[in-house]
Amino acid sequence: MRMDNKKFNFRLACIMGVGGLLRFFYVLFSTIYERQYDIGMIDLDAGHTVSGGHLAYIQYLYHNWHLPDMDPTTVYQFHHPPLHHYVCAAWMKFCSVFIKNTDILEESIQAVPFLCSLLILWVLYLIVKQFALTDKTKLFVMALFCVHPSLILLSGSVNNDAMALLFTLLTVYTTMVWCRTKTLVSLMGIALSIALGMCTKQNVAEMAFPVAAVFLYELIKEWKKSGFPAKRIGHFAVFGLVSIPLGMSFYVRNLIKYNTPLVWVYELAEDSWQYTGHIPVINRFLWPVPTELVDNLTHFRIGCGYNVWMQIIRTSVLGEWDMDGVGRSVKLLAVVLMLFGALLAAWSLAVFVDVFVLRCKKYSIAMPNRILFLGGYVVNMLFYLVFAYRYPQECSMHFRYIEITLLFPAVALGFWLQGTDKTWMRWGAGLLLAAFAVCSACMTIVWGVTAG
């Protein structure tokens, strides 16, 4: 059903506004050291010493304005491509003209992920608009994105996760646009999205595989219809000339200067408290020990950190938040939020298979979009599971590595809800989302009021 444009725009603005306010509240009351990952330290007053972590990387670029002149694998987190860190350093340079208090200047770094988090919502809406969804369904899907805790946590995360997700989503969106227009300009949009994403974080390259599958499908289709597609192959050659040198520049530089492998991952030691390699594979990748799971839930603990699915559920709504110092009521809220999130995820995943595989003809989803969404989900999950297996640490199973997988089942859930004739199902989905949203908002408030 299509709403009046003014009514739809007003409701969309309200939903997006709530999402923006939740992110603003979270950033305003959370410091650059709270609920962060691999950040190290920054101290502008002390001058720069080469220490490790994302904040130290940003400070190095802020002071020196050039890439580190040492083997990046010898300093913690300096092996990451530098685009996010350069943008943060440039933002600090700009702010330093007006801000003389170094504590405030250091905290201003959060403006970059906050802006990325708002742009993420905008690009998500652009993607949702590409599908034949009703206005009510679009609002439902956008509400899910706006209140999801993992996307709220990104708004204050000073590492490169927010910018990486932004470029990954731009890759999806520009690919969908190219499938419709087939112009060289739209193709360059894909090239820049992937390349700049790889200049931000290496795992953005995972979306190149489903994009390549879409290219191959369109090439074969055009060849069958119109003969040898010389013009299209020429366009793809230009695509490669733009995306490969730019996207691979940092990695090739390190290979030439320091003999660093093109794919290099920092590994924690086996004596780390996060190590899970001693746990049976069946408990890591299928199900946790049942008695331990029940005991954790009944005592409001977030445990079974060795199990990949429990870690996905937990970190998708709570990150790696250490809850040892919080009260029983907050732990109860965390468990309820986790359960609502798990229900939404399970429902969405089930209908994702139904919409994009089993009954795709009913929903009239174009083949390129099916390839992109199915391929995007499967490829990202496969890389994630292989990564978790090869590097058996709790941090290797964090949901932030696969946040793009929020998109694909959420869109499928929208299609399924508008296609079902069961009113109680639609009401049930709405109530579940409302409960999830309330718990998410309450948890965001808890994070704010308990911030240091």
PLM regions and their residue ranges:
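Perimembrane helix-loop-helix junctions
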Residues: 177-180, 207-244
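Short acidic/glycine- and proline-prone juxtamembrane loop motifs at membrane-interface regions
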Residues: 150-164
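Transmembrane-helix signature of polytopic, membrane-embedded enzymes
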Residues: 100-104, 124-147, 166
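Specific aromatic-rich, kink-prone transmembrane helix
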Residues: 119, 123-126, 163-180, 192-194, ...
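Extracytosolic helix-loop segments that constitute the early lumenal/periplasmic catalytic or substrate-binding loops
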Residues: 28, 32-79, 83, 93-96, ...
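Membrane-lumen/periplasm interface segments of specific transmembrane helices
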Residues: 234-347
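Transmembrane-helix motifs of polytopic, lipid-linked glycan transferases
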Residues: 107-132, 170
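Membrane-interface transmembrane helices that cradle and orient dolichyl/undecaprenyl
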Residues: 130-132, 171-187, 197, 219-221
